[in-house]
Curated annotation (Swiss-Prot):
Organism: Kluyveromyces lactis (strain ATCC 8585 / CBS 2359 / DSM 70799 / NBRC 1267 / NRRL Y-1140 / WM37)
Cited function: Component of the biogenesis of lysosome-related organelles complex-1 (BLOC-1), a complex involved in endosomal cargo sorting.
Keywords: Endosome, Transport
Coiled coil (residue ranges): none
Family (UniProt): Belongs to the BLOC1S1 family.
Record text on subunit structure and interactions: Component of the biogenesis of lysosome-related organelles complex-1 (BLOC-1).
Gene Ontology CC annotations of this record: endosome
Protein's cellular compartments: Endosome
Main location per the UniProt record: other
Record-given protein name: Biogenesis of lysosome-related organelles complex 1 subunit BLS1
Amino acid sequence: MMSNERTLLNQLIKSKTDTVGSEILKEIEGNDEYIKDVQLKKLKELHDKKFKEKGVTPLIRLYEKYNACALNDGDLQNWAELIDRDIRILEGTIKILEDESNEG
C-alpha cells in the first residue's frame, strides 16, 4: 500500500493538470488581487470623495462665508478704539468744564 500512496503522490506532484485544491487557491489569489487592486482603490476614492463632501467642503464654505466677517471684526476693533478715544476726550473735556464752573 505504501508504494501505491507513493505512486499517487508522485503523480500528483508531477501532474501538469490543476487539482481542485490548486484551482481554489488560484481563485483565492485572483480574488485577493482584484480586491486589493480594484475594490480597495475604488473604496479609497469613494471614502476620499465622501470625506471631502461631508467634511472639507462645508468647512471651506464656512471659512469663505465668515472670513469677510472676521476682517470686518478687525475693522470693528479699530472703530471701538476710535470711539473709546473720543469718549475719553469728551470725558476729559467735561471734567475740565466742570472744574472751571466750580471755580468760577
